[in-house]
From Swiss-Prot:
Its EC number is 2.8.3.-, 2.8.3.13. This is Succinyl-CoA:glutarate CoA-transferase. It catalyses: glutarate + succinyl-CoA = glutaryl-CoA + succinate; 3-hydroxy-3-methylglutarate + succinyl-CoA = (3S)-3-hydroxy-3-methylglutaryl-CoA + succinate; 3-hydroxy-3-methylglutarate + glutaryl-CoA = (3S)-3-hydroxy-3-methylglutaryl-CoA + glutarate; hexanedioate + glutaryl-CoA = hexanedioyl-CoA + glutarate. GO terms for cellular component: mitochondrion. Belongs to the CoA-transferase III family. It is an enzyme of class 2 (transferase). PANTHER family: SUCCINATE--HYDROXYMETHYLGLUTARATE COA-TRANSFERASE. The active site is at D203. Coenzyme A (CoA) transferase that reversibly catalyzes the transfer of a CoA moiety from a dicarboxyl-CoA to a dicarboxylate in a metabolite recycling process. Displays preference for succinyl-CoA and glutarate-CoA as dicarboxyl-CoA donors and glutarate, succinate, adipate/hexanedioate, itaconate and 3-hydroxy-3-methylglutarate as dicarboxylate acceptors. Acts on intermediates or end products of lysine and tryptophan degradation pathway, in particular catalyzes succinyl-CoA-dependent reesterification of free glutarate into glutaryl-CoA to prevent renal excretion of glutarate.
Length: 436
């Protein structure tokens, strides 16, 4: 414990995490750092699994943070076994959200494993976890425990429902939170059953909220010199994302319903079936509706008293959609794409994934990131969505093997000697995966 406190004090004296430094994380002048990624020098201890937490820490890693991923010996992150598909023995699910991380396999149910995590926390800037509230406290790794040895720490807890309250003890999964938050209630065919979104939007939204909250926590620490606790959860994240649908109910007492691909307040704004596929168009104002009618060669609709305003078009939705649907079905998607090009009307096809990753704009935006994995070889995953003018998001490190960096972290970061490391390996407290 004294060793950990000494490291924490040294960390504080170094200027990291204190107000008044030249930069947020280092003492180097900003004029010399134009090409640096903003989180270079930030170290993150990541005890998260599955999607929300790993997605948050992956995004932090993209910005230059050093992410140390703590995993269970033998099994690791739950998603390592999620599949098919697998590439060799690697789950593509795991590969999708774990780039730019180092893996240390530690048994945190063993007191010696807990000590390792505490020693790492003492020299890290951020601690992220997604255990059920109270679980880590039972092991001595809750916020109160870490705050004692690392008062500078930004501690982010990602849960299903929050730290307190009648449901706080429950485990949280995306689909459950999606259902309880109302997202499934508003997703699916108008007259059909509720539908789960095709990707785990609640997990991803929570990951983005956590990502932003951690960034805010680091800035707060820079200003105050003190760490803090962040409570982030799936239910709150998804309810917050209901935006105008929630406001319709809270302000207008209007219960939401499912609209398929359509929009409850804008007409036309939905997918239309063509001869060979689907095209989504949106006419958000009267001018766009007029342009749409001209492209479709239906000029008589422009001045029709039933469709002159969006309010009227919403009232007469079924009749208008029937007319438009019949017209769109007369041509193939490619023909419509040509006709809408340059019109100012928002439009686009419903793409398969094959279509997505051959789409010219997707290729132009550099959204496919390639990496060389130590056992799989070359892999491709979706890359960062945001680009910056002063630094590049290139040269990503591939997702780690389970325990790939255990020995390195213990020896180079915590300064353990080989004898201690060997003893921990033999006892099963840690695991090291050797690469060729």
């Amino acid at each position: 414990m004294l060793r950990m406190l000494a490291r924490a004090v040294a960390f504080r004296r170094s200027g990291r995490g204190q107000a008044g430094g030249r930069g947020l994380w280092t003492g180097r002048p900003q004029s010399d750092c134009d090409s640096m990624k903003p989180l270079e020098g930030v170290r993150i201890l990541d005890l998260t699994r599955v999607l929300a937490g790993p997605f948050a820490t992956m995004n932090l890693g993209d910005l230059g943070a050093e992410v140390i991923k703590v995993e269970r010996p033998g099994a690791g992150d739950d998603t390592r076994s999620w599949g098919p598909p697998f590439v060799n023995t690697e789950s593509t699910y795991f590969l999708s959200v774990n780039r730019n991380k180092k893996s240390i396999a530690v048994n945190i149910k063993d007191p010696r494993g807990v000590r390792i995590v505490k020693e790492l926390a003492a020299i890290c800037d951020v601690f992220v976890e997604n255990y059920v509230p109270g679980k880590l406290s039972e092991m001595g790794l809750g916020y109160a425990d870490i705050d004692k040895i690392a008062p500078h720490i930004v501690y982010c807890s990602i849960t299903g429902y929050g730290q307190t309250g009648p449901m706080s003890h429950r485990a949280g999964y995306d689909a459950i939170a999606s259902a309880m938050s109302g997202l499934m209630h508003i997703t699916g065919p108008e007259d059909g059953d509720p539908v789960r979104p095709g990707v785990a939007m609640t997990d991803l939204a929570t990951g983005l909220f956590a990502y932003g909250a951690i960034m805010a926590g680091l800035i707060q620490r820079y200003r105050t010199g003190k760490g803090l606790f962040i409570d982030c959860n799936l239910l709150s994240s998804q309810v917050a994302c209901l935006t105008q649908v929630a406001a319709n109910y809270l302000i207008g007492q209007k219960e939401a319903k499912r609209w398929g691909t359509a929009h409850g307040s804008i007409v036309p704004y939905q997918a239309f079936k063509t001869k060979d596929g689907y095209l989504v168009i949106g006419a958000g104002n009267n001018q766009q509706f007029a342009v749409l009618c001209k492209i479709l060669n239906l000029p008589e609709l422009i001045d029709d008293s039933k469709y002159r305003t969006n309010h009227l078009r919403v009232q007469n939705r079924k009749e208008l959609v029937k007319i438009l649907s019949a017209r769109f079905a007369e041509e193939v998607t490619a023909k419509w794409l040509c006709l809408f090009e340059g019109s100012g009307i928002p439009y686009g096809p419903i793409n398969s994934l094959k279509d997505v990753f051959s789409e010219a704009q997707v290729l132009h935006n550099g959204l496919v990131m390639e990496m060389n994995h130590p056992t799989v070889g070359k892999i491709s995953v979706p890359g960062p969505a945001v680009r910056y003018s002063k630094f590049k998001m290139s040269e990503a490190k591939p997702p780690p093997l389970l325990g790939q960096h255990t020995r390195h972290i213990l020896k180079e970061v915590l300064r353990y000697d080989e004898g201690v490391i060997g003893e921990l390996l033999c006892s099963g407290v840690i695991e090291q995966h050797e690469t060729e």
